[in-house]
Regions:
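AMP-binding/adenylate-forming catalytic core of the ANL superfamily
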Residues: 1-87, 100-104
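Conserved C-terminal "lid"/linker of ANL adenylate-forming enzymes
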Residues: 24-26, 77-136
Length: 136
């Protein structure tokens, strides 16, 4: 973080990815005031989950990413991840993205590893305007 705290993102990301419809979680904090996460949804797993909650399983992914029930379920897993770390290491904010990180969109390697610098670059505007906005 900007405060000099080194945080290992792997364990936090793994807990968040235990949510049945989360495909990827990318924990961010380097040179940032607090820890945050970008979360992607697995459409195949999400659709039956939505239906099981009495929600429309056919909503567009953009709408699903902003759905209150989806957000609440992801928040449960973020909270669980935060239980195992100090306050300085905990995820304070997260954004659910409407698209996954893939090789096709250039955000994953052939060995299915997320390319952090490319993700950060692609979502820089979102991070700067929604995640790390300065309060006036």
């Amino acid at each position: 973080t900007a405060g000099g705290k080194n945080v290992s993102p792997g364990p936090i990301e793994e807990v968040i990815k235990r949510c049945e419809f989360v495909s990827q979680a990318l924990v961010l904090g380097d040179k940032r005031p607090f820890i945050s996460a970008l979360v992607t949804l697995d459409e195949e797993s999400l659709r039956p989950w939505l239906e099981s909650k009495g929600l429309n399983r056919d909503i567009p992914m953009e709408e699903a990413a902003n759905n209150a029930a989806v957000r609440a379920e992801v928040q449960k897993w973020v909270d669980q991840a935060n239980e195992g770390v100090s306050r300085a290491e905990s995820v304070r904010k997260f954004i659910i993205l409407p698209e996954e990180f893939t090789q096709e969109n250039g955000l994953m390697t052939a060995s299915m590893k997320v390319i952090r610098p490319k993700v950060i670059k692609r979502y820089a505007t979102l991070l700067n305007t929604q995640m790390y906005t300065k309060k006036k």
